Amino acid sequence: MNLPKKVRLVEVGPRDGLQNEKQPIEVADKIRLVDDLSAAGLDYIEVGSFVSPKWVPQMAGSAEVFAGIRQRPGVTYAALAPNLKGFEAALESGVKEVAVFAAASEAFSQRNINCSIKDSLERFVPVLEAARQHQVRVRGYISCVLGCPYDGDVDPRQVAWVARELQQMGCYEVSLGDTIGVGTAGATRRLIEAVASEVPRERLAGHFHDTYGQALANIYASLLEGIAVFDSSVAGLGGCPYAKGATGNVASEDVLYLLNGLEIHTGVDMHALVDAGQRICAVLGKSNGSRAAKALLAKA
């Protein structure tokens, strides 16, 4: 069994996780979460999003969060910046890495960002050009790679095309997102094989939601395909405001438990991660969405 010896976890809880919460979240609580996550050993954290508060009110205050966090050496603190205005705001906050997002489904693209896939990619061109000028790295996301809430099945060749376009534009890595969590291990392997014909596996990442309880199976399938970067969210926070009924991202604690069992190195401390998840869940007044965290807390 030829699995990666090391995996990089991309912690998306502070951005993708919190953006769907209904109640306002204090900047101080967001700062504490990011600091807790970096202290747990996560070396890539998506801190916030520079988008219009009209569209994503929970991401208001991202500049203050960046100003307040304790930035540790060797940790990447990234932000979503889907347009030039957002990129410029991120730059003012000292952000060294940003992410842009496209979709593999035309219907999802129209409902999520109000334009076609082709138009959305064209919008990123000035962002990528500005990023090159300022030596800011750019990561690309693709939504709905294994299914769409409006279009149903998504052709892996369409995903491969979007991934190739993002890479050619200058994205150093492309994260493949199963936004509504319908993917299975077999479909995941077929998807990666298709996308890897256009983009090298070492430049791909997996982003799985657990709607049907398949996220860990899909991560394992991805590991078998040579993928060594995965997005996850502490305590399983998050969902998708544009995909009705979609549950949260796969929990970071659950992914870590899987990887620890496979003796794959991550550099993340499980107990510190569980504590970080419990603290933010207490702030939000909700139960922890991680099964591993709940099991470990029950033993404590």
From Swiss-Prot:
Q: Which reaction does it catalyse?
A: 3-hydroxy-3-(4-methylpent-3-en-1-yl)glutaryl-CoA = 7-methyl-3-oxooct-6-enoyl-CoA + acetate; (3S)-3-hydroxy-3-methylglutaryl-CoA = acetoacetate + acetyl-CoA
GO MF annotation terms? 3-hydroxy-3-isohexenylglutaryl-CoA lyase activity; hydroxymethylglutaryl-CoA lyase activity; metal ion binding
Pathway listed for it? Metabolic intermediate metabolism; (S)-3-hydroxy-3-methylglutaryl-CoA degradation; acetoacetate from (S)-3-hydroxy-3-methylglutaryl-CoA: step 1/1
Q: Which SUPFAM superfamilies match?
A: Aldolase
Enzyme class (EC, first level): lyase
Required cofactor names? Mg(2+); Mn(2+)
User: Know the name of this protein?
Assistant: 3-hydroxy-3-isohexenylglutaryl-CoA/hydroxy-methylglutaryl-CoA lyase
| Source organism of this protein record | Pseudomonas aeruginosa (strain ATCC 15692 / DSM 22644 / CIP 104116 / JCM 14847 / LMG 12228 / 1C / PRS 101 / PAO1)
Gene that encodes the chain: liuE
